[in-house]
């Protein structure tokens, strides 16, 4: 059976934790940051866990993680 290809766009966006879950960045922290509060920007800077309903799709895009 041939090797499976990794989706490079997904490989740049997701990381796998030690327990096998996937982490992702939160949206809304790239530009237009002047009017957003410091607390809001700080909360957006932390990594989020990918929802369990999306985990299967992410794992199919990243077969070797």
Curated annotation (Swiss-Prot):
A single GO BP: translation
Protein origin, superkingdom: Bacteria
What keywords does the record list, in alphabetical order? Ribonucleoprotein, Ribosomal protein
Quote a single Gene Ontology cellular component term.
cytosolic large ribosomal subunit
- Provide the GO MF annotations for this entry: structural constituent of ribosome
Q: Which InterPro entries match?
A: Ribosomal_bL35 (IPR001706), Ribosomal_bL35-like (IPR021137), Ribosomal_bL35_CS (IPR018265), Ribosomal_bL35_sf (IPR037229)
Transcription in keyword set? no
In residue numbers, the region (Disordered) covers 1-28
- Cite the record's Basic residues compositional bias ranges: 1-15
* Pfam families xrefs: Ribosomal_L35p (PF01632)
Family membership, please give it.
Answer: Belongs to the bacterial ribosomal protein bL35 family.
- Which NCBIfam families is this protein grouped with? rpmI_bact
PANTHER family per UniProt: 54S RIBOSOMAL PROTEIN BL35M (PTHR33343), LARGE RIBOSOMAL SUBUNIT PROTEIN BL35M (PTHR33343:SF1)
Under what name is this protein listed? Large ribosomal subunit protein bL35
Q: Which organism is it from?
A: Cyanothece sp. (strain PCC 7425 / ATCC 29141)
Give the organism's phylogenetic lineage.
Answer: Bacteria, Bacillati, Cyanobacteriota, Cyanophyceae, Gomontiellales
């Amino acid at each position: 059976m041939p090797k499976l290809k990794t989706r490079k766009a997904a490989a740049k966006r997701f990381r796998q934790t030690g327990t096998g879950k996937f982490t992702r960045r939160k949206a809304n922290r790239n530009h237009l940051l002047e009017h957003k509060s410091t607390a809001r920007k700080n909360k957006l800077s932390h990594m989020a866990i990918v929802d369990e309903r999306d985990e299967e799709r992410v794992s199919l895009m990243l077969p070797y993680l």
